């Protein structure tokens, strides 16, 4: 068979590296061998690198990646034919065939193998030199009979690196989307930013467990520039992992092939799953030697960056526990500067808003003052124009105003007469403990006991006897000169009228003409609250007073209906309601109680001021004074 047929057709023991376009043959070693200790020793030996007139020399172990310690074969490995101190080297002859350069340690009968395979395995030499390639496993002497019969001839092929590049990067075999440099850069920068953010937040170092799918060219340049540091890390991790890289000679320095990390990793994963060795290629600028890469163990994840001495490029196969340097705080200097600027701006904005609010408040205050001044000016001008025809009467008006002021002062003094010491002692004596049924005052067919007087002490609620007695004293005072005539109904009157109607209270006014008086006082009890309704015949009005600001127009309508029925029953005529008005005083118009116990006192004092035709000018602060004063008035049956 000719040379072409040798390069194309292969026996069961031949393996063709399609990516390289070269055919390698392996031969079965003889049956005889050496002990297992020698095998282990020969596998662990460092394989020296020879340089001479040949283009390159390679060494290779004879154990397949699928080798396991529990695997037993009848045919021992060819390593058994080597002594413990022997080193196998292979050179390239002038005709392109591989020859054995290792001197024979002894002669032994040889037998061809029944099945032949190409065994590739990753090794790392202890000397840290480049990885080497082994072609055959039975070269224990200069030339064997089998080798003479079946010489190994490499198949003609184009440039090694070019064929590898075309075979691995060919779009026909693997169709994948290639990311642009900009996209890869953006992805890597986003990932780096997120990693640094996690490091700042947690205070821990975060490392990338494996390289990204698309490795940026910028990072590759950084790795090639730091080849010395990578070599040191390779030497330190020599006992944990081993990887070999096959490179190719290039016809020119510009024809170097580049493999991405994604293709290498995917190809390695496929080779591990199928049990075949993984071959990766890369070109070196200054070193034309070839390197073969194969996984060390399927269950181990080695990571090594291999490069030849004097090389300017590096090929990253895997990364194992890569130590990412601590991120520099300068990366976030721009963000910190933005935050600082924003905080300064926010403080200035708050200060500016505060000043604006102050100016608005000041402007509003000045505007109100200006409006008040304008109102006063308008009122003064109107009053001036009205007084011009009455200029001669101005002194008389001034004199009248002076008298009114003096009269108001005397009224205010009479409104709150002072309680003397004797009065104070008498009041305290009544509040002392004693017989609760003791009668302290009796008038108007009413009896006031000590128990009733105790309702005026502190914040107690007033009862019906106290309110009815006080209303009768108001009626008695109205008989005096200068006071309007008053009739006060009993505290049970309105409740009876509302629930039972007019017929239930018809006989209550048998001896009284309600239409002959000026004012009718109607105390209204709402269960837990006292109010007052006032019927003023002089003003034709019915007004409702509530110290809690309540509105009760219904009570006013009930009283108006009562007047109609009372007029028909007593006078035998219809009551004229023309001009009558119903009111409910608002909380802004009358004093309001500030607790939950003075409602009875407020109702009584409303009636006191109304029956004197005086304005209601007391407040919640006057209630303690009014309680003491009412005690004295009830005891003496006389209003102050």
UniProtKB/Swiss-Prot annotation:
Listed Low complexity bias regions: 38-47
InterPro entries: Papain-like_cys_pep_sf (IPR038765), Peptidase_C48_C (IPR003653)
Keywords, sorted A to Z: Cytoplasm, Developmental protein, Hydrolase, Nucleus, Phosphoprotein, Protease, Thiol protease, Ubl conjugation pathway
Positions annotated as active site in the UniProt record: 529, 546, 599 (nucleophile)
Region (Protease): 446-609, 446-610
Modification type Phosphoserine: residues: 57, 117, 157
Motif Nuclear localization signal location, chain numbering: 171-177, 570-573, 624-630
EC number: 3.4.22.-
Compartments, record wording: Nucleus; Cytoplasm
Recorded superkingdom: Eukaryota
GO biological process assignments: negative regulation of proteasomal ubiquitin-dependent protein catabolic process; positive regulation of transcription by RNA polymerase II; proteasome-mediated ubiquitin-dependent protein catabolic process; protein desumoylation; protein sumoylation; regulation of definitive erythrocyte differentiation; regulation of mRNA stability; regulation of postsynapse assembly
GO CC list: focal adhesion; glutamatergic synapse; nuclear membrane; nucleoplasm; postsynaptic cytosol; presynaptic cytosol
Chain intervals for the UniProt region annotation (Disordered): 19-122, 267-309
Biased composition regions of type Polar residues, renumbered to the chain: 54-64, 90-108, 267-276, 297-309
Annotated knockout phenotype: Death between 13.5 dpc and 14.5 dpc due to abnormalities in fetal vessels.
An example molecular function term from Gene Ontology annotations: SUMO-specific endopeptidase activity
Enzyme class, spelled out: hydrolase
Transmembrane segments: none
Motif Nuclear export signal: chain residues: 631-640
Region described as Interaction with CCAR2: spans on this chain: 1-200
SUPFAM superfamilies (alphabetical): Cysteine proteinases
Family affiliation: Belongs to the peptidase C48 family.
UniProt subunit comment: Interacts with RBM33; promoting ALKBH5 desumoylation and subsequent activation.
Protein task: Protease that catalyzes two essential functions in the SUMO pathway. The first is the hydrolysis of an alpha-linked peptide bond at the C-terminal end of the small ubiquitin-like modifier (SUMO) propeptides, SUMO1, SUMO2 and SUMO3 leading to the mature form of the proteins. The second is the deconjugation of SUMO1, SUMO2 and SUMO3 from targeted proteins, by cleaving an epsilon-linked peptide bond between the C-terminal glycine of the mature SUMO and the lysine epsilon-amino group of the target protein. Deconjugates SUMO1 from HIPK2.
Protein name per its UniProtKB record: Sentrin-specific protease 1
Gene: Senp1
């Amino acid at each position: 068979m000719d040379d072409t047929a040798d390069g194309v057709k292969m026996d069961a023991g031949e393996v063709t590296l399609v990516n390289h376009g070269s055919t390698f043959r392996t031969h079965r070693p003889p049956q005889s061998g050496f002990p297992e200790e020698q095998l282990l020793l020969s596998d662990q030996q460092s394989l020296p690198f020879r340089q001479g007139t040949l283009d390159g020399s390679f060494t290779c172990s004879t154990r397949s990646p699928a080798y396991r310690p529990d695997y037993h074969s009848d045919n021992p490995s060819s390593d058994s034919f080597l002594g413990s101190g022997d080193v196998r080297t292979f050179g390239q002859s002038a005709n392109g065939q591989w020859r054995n350069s290792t001197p024979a340690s002894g002669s032994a009968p040889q037998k061809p193998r029944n099945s032949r395979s190409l065994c590739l395995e990753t090794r790392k030499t202890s000397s840290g030199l480049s990885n080497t390639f082994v072609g055959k496993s039975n070269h224990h002497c200069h030339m064997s009979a089998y080798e003479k019969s079946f010489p190994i001839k490499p198949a003609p092929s184009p440039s090694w690196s070019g064929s590898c590049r075309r075979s691995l990067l060919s779009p026909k075999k693997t169709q994948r989307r290639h990311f642009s440099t900009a996209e890869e850069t953006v992805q890597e920068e986003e990932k780096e930013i997120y990693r640094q953010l996690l490091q700042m937040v947690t205070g821990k170092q975060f490392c990338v467990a494996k390289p990204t799918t698309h490795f940026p060219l910028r990072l590759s340049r950084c790795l090639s520039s730091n080849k010395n540091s990578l070599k040191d890390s390779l030497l330190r991790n020599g006992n944990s992992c081993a990887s070999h890289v096959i490179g190719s000679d290039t016809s020119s320095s510009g024809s170097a092939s580049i493999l991405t990390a994604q293709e290498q990793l995917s190809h390695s994963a496929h080779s591990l799953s199928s049990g075949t060795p993984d071959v990766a290629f890369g070109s070196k600028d200054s070193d034309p030697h070839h390197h073969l890469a194969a996984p060390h163990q399927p269950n181990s994840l080695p990571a090594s960056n291999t490069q030849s001495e004097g090389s300017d490029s590096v090929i990253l196969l895997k990364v194992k526990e890569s130590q990412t340097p601590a991120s520099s705080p300068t990366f976030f200097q721009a963000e910190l500067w933005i935050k600082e600027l924003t905080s300064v701006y926010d403080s200035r904005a708050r200060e500016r808003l505060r000043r604006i609010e102050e100016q608005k408040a000041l402007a509003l205050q000045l505007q109100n003052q200006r409006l008040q001044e304008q109102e006063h000016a308008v009122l003064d001008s109107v009053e001036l124009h009205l007084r011009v025809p009455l200029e001669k009467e101005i002194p008389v008006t001034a004199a009248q105003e002076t008298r009114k002021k003096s009269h108001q002062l005397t009224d205010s003094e009479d409104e709150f007469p002072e309680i003397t010491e004797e009065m104070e002692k008498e009041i305290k004596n009544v509040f002392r403990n004693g017989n609760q049924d003791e009668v302290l005052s009796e008038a108007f067919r009413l009896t006031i006991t000590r128990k009733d007087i105790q309702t005026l002490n502190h914040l107690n609620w007033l009862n019906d006897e106290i309110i009815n007695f006080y209303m009768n004293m108001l009626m008695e005072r109205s008989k005096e000169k200068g006071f309007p005539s008053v009739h006060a109904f009993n505290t049970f009157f309105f409740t009876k009228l509302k629930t039972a109607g007019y017929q239930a209270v018809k006989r209550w006014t048998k001896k009284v003409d309600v239409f002959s008086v000026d004012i009718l006082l109607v105390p209204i009890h709402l269960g837990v609250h006292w109010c007052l309704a006032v019927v003023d015949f002089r003003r034709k009005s019915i007004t409702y007073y509530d110290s809690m600001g309540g509105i009760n127009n219904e009570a006013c309508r009930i009283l108006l209906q009562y007047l109609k029925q009372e007029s028909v029953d007593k006078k035998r005529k219809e009551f004229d309601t023309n001009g009558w008005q119903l009111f409910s005083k608002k909380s802004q118009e009358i004093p309001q109680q500030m607790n939950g116990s003075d409602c009875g006192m407020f109702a009584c004092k409303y009636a006191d001021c109304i029956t004197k035709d005086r304005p209601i000018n007391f407040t919640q602060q006057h209630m303690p004074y009014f309680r003491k004063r009412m005690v004295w008035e009830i005891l003496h049956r006389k209003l102050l």
